Every structure is written in structure tokens, then in C-alpha cells.
Amino acid sequence: MTFYCLCMSPAIDATVRLPCAPKGGGEIFKDVAEDENVGGKAVNVARWLALRGARVVCGGLLGEDNDRPFVRELSKYGIEDRFLRVAGSTRRNEMITWPGGSMKINRPAFPGLSKDFDCMAAAESLAGDSGVSGATVIISGSLPSALPAGFYARAVAYFKSLGWKTVLDASGEAMRLGLEAGPDLIKPNAEECEPLVGFVPKTQDEFAEATSLLRRKAGHVVISAGASGAWFDGEFVAAPEVDVVDTTAAGDTLLAEYCWSGDAAWAVAAGSAACTMPGGAPPPIDVVHRLKEGV
């Protein structure tokens, strides 16, 4: 089984763990722990799929000034690198955690990218010679501000023309326009549903209504609902309780496992397991197995 992952806004994800909660400013913390992993939503998806045994090709954009960590990571997991290199550096994001709380700093991707940049070149580079039939492409993450919001719609249409199954996980205008191209599967979270259906679903009836509205344009709909679980075409799967370390790759791991296995319970268990890992690192499969028993 071959999966292609398109990541236009990769990141180096750092997690800094403080020993206690900040008290309002001025503190100096010396006893801290820090982990760093390369990521970006589609990179997180690619990594989990590779761990599950899939053939994975990953592409999109990488800053040429600091691509070496990504090259090492992709090689480590046997993921084929078809990223386009652009001038500058790939962004670095931070998750700062302490007992009982956290905050996240997300920086913009490729702020120096020209508005004339040929964004479809990234999709075409990922596809290569397009000789693979029956593949699945996961288009995931935000877009650099220089790129048009309609890019994902163009990408979905392009990959569909190759006969590939298309999966879209984005937000805002990029997701709204991408939905118009009729992807096979989408995965918004509850808050990301608002610009798509006009409300944030909170009750069972509202999740059912949101799913029904979204399935007018998408083949299948997964709506993640944070620590409570996720809705798969209107069916709720509750998440097991875990000690949360970092939620960076939880939704990405859930989506990747669902694309791999098609099993909602496995997907929720994988997403929950990802919350126990720092900096977006993939969870051990034995942890997923254990959590699956509680789903």
C-alpha cells in the first residue's frame, strides 16, 4: 500500500518542560527538559504510516538552510523525500508545558516565499511520474501565507485526476475551498467545522448534522473532538484516558492510523497514545495495543 503525504508547512517541533507553572513573568527556569522532533502535520502522518509498514512518499516545501534534520528523519523511517527546497529556513515551533498546563508558539511558515511561487510544482514533485495506481494522498496542514487559499482545491483535483484517493486535513479558507473539490475523506476538528457548516458541534445531534452537511461534498468525514474522542461518519468512538504530555501529533496519528487500518477504534487509540509522547514523536505500538483494549 502506497501513501503520499503533502506538507506545505513543515516545522521543527520543540517541547520545553518546566518543573512548575510560571507565576506571571520574570522567572528564570534552569531545570528544564527539552525534546525536538521534525514535524508538520503531513510529516507526522507519514512517519506513523511508515511505522505501520506502508510505502510512504513525502513532499511539499522545505527550507534549504535547515533541511538536514528532515533528511535524517525521512531516511530513518524509510520515507522517500520529494520535498522542494526553497530559500530560507523551515520554521521552529515550541510547546511549553508544566504540571497542569501548557502553551504553544506556532511561527509562520516560509514568510519570505514569493506570491508568484508555483505551488503546484510541489504537488507535481510529490506525484513524480504518476505511475502508481490506487494510491492515497494525504494533504495536511496549514498553507504559507504567500500561497493562495485555493491551492488545496487545485491539489485535490490534480491527485483525483491521477486516480488517487484524496484525504484533506486543513482549516479555515483552505479547507473550505478544498472541500469544494470533493475529497474522499476530510478530518476537521470540532472548532474547524464552524466555517464549513456554520456552527461548532457540541452535542450528538450537532455532530450528526455537521457530518451530514460535510458529506454532501466529501466522501467520508472524521471529526476529532479532543480528549473525548472522535466521530467517524457520525459514529462516536470515545478516547481512553491518558496522561497527556504533548498533543502536537495526536490528530495526525489518529488520521494516519485510520488511513492505514480503516479501524476507528485503532485510530482513536493511536491518537491517544500520541498524546503521551513529547514533541510529536510517534508512540510505541505496544502502547497503542494496550489503549485499544480500553476503546
Regions found by a protein language model. Name each.
Residues M1-G59:
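Glycine-rich phosphate/adenosyl-contacting loop at the front of the ribokinase-like
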Residues F3, A54-V56, D81, T166, ...:
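Hydrophobic anchor at the start of a short beta-strand
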Residues F29-N37, V237-A249:
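Short pre-catalytic strand/loop immediately N-terminal to key active-site residues, enriched for Gly-Thr
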Residues R47, R92-I96, G229-D233:
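Short beta-strand scaffold segments in enzyme catalytic cores
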Residues A50-A135, R290-V295:
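Conserved N-terminal subdomain of the carbohydrate kinase-like
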Residues K104-N106, G134-S142, D169, K187-A190:
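Short beta-strands and strand-loop turn motifs
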Residues A149-G234:
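Conserved phosphate/ATP/ADP-binding segment of small-molecule kinases
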